[in-house]
């Protein structure tokens, strides 16, 4: 029989109609000779009533066989429920069953198929197809589908062309590790799965496509955390002849449309803009969460003369003030914060409390000479807790930035209903890598340097600034973009600054350099992490919740057991050998 509608769509206007529904048995209850079934499908739950006086013996016998997660087909008439269930969208009606067929049986599931059930992450991933049956999960994927639909329509209406770029591409240095794919035909050679379509989308601008977009899978072999996966999806854009501001305007309009159509929220445009240096100095992060205060305060000059070497000899002394919560933090609690701070390079954490206008704590005695200045500078009041880090400016910023976020979450200071977007601009072109002992691209080596700082490519790389911009939401980097280099001599200077020899640059990027000899237009773009955007829209804290079949923190899939060993025959075809090290 053909399904009449989804179970979750049945309403009072359908009373009196005979309909056919199909779905899963969510729950079965026997009560006073009647059998009640909660039938679940993609759109919700509908109560079925099977009365032995209204059905044949065969139907009743079939009903008695039903267990959770059996797949069934039912026919019956829609009737008003005697006692409505306000918790269900279908709660005013029920289906009086006249026909019932079991389409498939089910084993007892390893966990209940309902929201809020306590199950380990690996168990959920092992039985992901069951986990995805839960209404909460289904809603997240409807939201994801709606988001991509809005994005496609918005960009289509602005004249963007959806172009697919290669999944098998060339491995290039810089950035995260590539996932490599051995070639059977060109033995000893490897493709790489793309970390982004960066170069190919730039080449599309050289081809005259003018406005490109793609919702594309990307791959990075990097350490995982809650908002990272080895394969992820991004909304990728590239444009020709547009300024930094014009690109940002397009992206803001897209985000505003997504927010309105998926959440019913009107966001204020334009988004605020914050210089990279201001973000680091005031928030301790290049992706600041502006939903709460507790900004970093620079006290380096104020405490320079105090008789406390930790402060007086430090390159930077910075602090955050936890307003009105000193009594929430015992000495033991602060010790935990200190150990946390050490994970980010700090040697320790100095602190004081304000009690009835006086400083208390282990460093209070060293600050008597500057107590009034500190009180005025930090606007201190009774029951304030002040946390200090004295170290390099980088360590002080990073440590206090992470402490700021941790404490705000601990004290429930963040309004989780708010969506705070902003642009972080005026980025440094390079960042120093302690591991590599050299400067590396803060974004990628195709980013255009500012006209004012480009001369420093042959001088002090720390002074080179980029025409780059990141879009941030609630402390998460949603995406990043920039204007790109379109002239060969500038691109060669960039490669040289990064330590490439001419031969290395030609070997890795010769095709791009050659393309720049054929009228490459000025261009720029941006990529937004779709998984991360949907995660935040859905109010989740891990992108696994909005990816259908994600990997765990070991980059493996407990369901399929990927990655897995392959046969010797497959290895021989690729002329590969596996060396086992004890």
Swiss-Prot record:
One cellular component term from this protein's GO annotations in UniProt: cytoplasm
Alphabetically sorted, this entry's keywords are:
Aminoacyl-tRNA synthetase, ATP-binding, Cytoplasm, Ligase, Nucleotide-binding, Protein biosynthesis
Which GO terms fall under biological process for this protein? aspartyl-tRNA aminoacylation
| Known EC number | 6.1.1.12
Q: Where in the cell is it found?
A: Cytoplasm
Q: Which InterPro entries match?
A: Aa-tRNA-synt_II, aa-tRNA-synth_II, aa-tRNA-synth_II/BPL/LPL, Asp-tRNA-ligase_1, Asp-tRNA-ligase_1_N, Asp/Asn-tRNA-synth_IIb, AspRS_core, GAD-like_sf
Give the catalysed reaction(s), semicolon-separated: tRNA(Asp) + L-aspartate + ATP = L-aspartyl-tRNA(Asp) + AMP + diphosphate
Q: Name one GO molecular function term.
A: ATP binding
Question: Which of this chain's residues are annotated to bind ATP?
Answer: 220-222, 229, 477, 529-532
Catalytic EC class: ligase
Which annotated residues bind L-aspartate? 174, 220, 443, 484
Q: Where is this region: Aspartate?
A: 198-201
Any Pfam family from its record, for instance, is tRNA_anti-codon
Query: Which function does this protein serve?
Result: Catalyzes the attachment of L-aspartate to tRNA(Asp) in a two-step reaction: L-aspartate is first activated by ATP to form Asp-AMP and then transferred to the acceptor end of tRNA(Asp).
Quaternary structure, from the entry: Homodimer.
Q: Tell me which family the UniProt entry assigns to this protein.
A: Belongs to the class-II aminoacyl-tRNA synthetase family. Type 1 subfamily.
**Name of the protein this chain belongs to:** Aspartate--tRNA ligase
Q: What is the lineage of its organism?
A: Bacteria, Bacillati, Bacillota, Bacilli, Lactobacillales
